[in-house]
Amino acid sequence: MKPSERRKARRLAVQAIYSWQLSGNNVADVEHEFLTEQELDGVDVAYFRELFAGAATKTAQLDEKLKPLLDRPLEEVSPVEKAILRLAVYELTFRKDVPYKVVINEAIELAKSFGAEDGHKFVNGILDKLVARN
């Protein structure tokens, strides 16, 4: 498996988490929608499924790790940045085989692509604090 396959899986997972957060649809329906309506060439589909389902079903646990690190209530964090942070916290917590530097770098790149102008700085700061605590 190439690193780019995981990068594409993360990109798709962030979009799915974002869609799930806003729509309120169940996880299985959102996953099905993404697997049938998105371009999946070069995507590690199994990794996408794990990241999306893991982040979506463990949201409360992930949010508890995030809340003490934030400079504002979680509800005030943009939905895009929240999706990126949930994905990254899931990987940092449950995928110990992925180096933390890779997870943080991937999250920063996702924030540059999808987030607000300085969203990547916010994401980087939060994840750096999380790694320092563990």
From Swiss-Prot:
Keyword annotations from UniProtKB, A to Z: RNA-binding, Transcription, Transcription antitermination, Transcription regulation
A GO CC term assigned to this protein in UniProt: cytosol
Biological process annotations from GO: DNA-templated transcription termination; transcription antitermination
InterPro entries (alphabetical): NusB-like_sf, NusB_fam, NusB_RsmB_TIM44
Single Gene Ontology MF annotation: RNA binding
UniProt cross-references to Gene3D superfamilies, sorted A to Z: NusB-like
Pfam family, one: NusB
Family statement drawn from the similarity comment of this UniProt entry: Belongs to the NusB family.
Stated role: Involved in transcription antitermination. Required for transcription of ribosomal RNA (rRNA) genes. Binds specifically to the boxA antiterminator sequence of the ribosomal RNA (rrn) operons.
Matching PANTHER family: ANTITERMINATION NUSB DOMAIN-CONTAINING PROTEIN, N UTILIZATION SUBSTANCE PROTEIN B-RELATED
Protein name: Transcription antitermination protein NusB
Gene designation: nusB
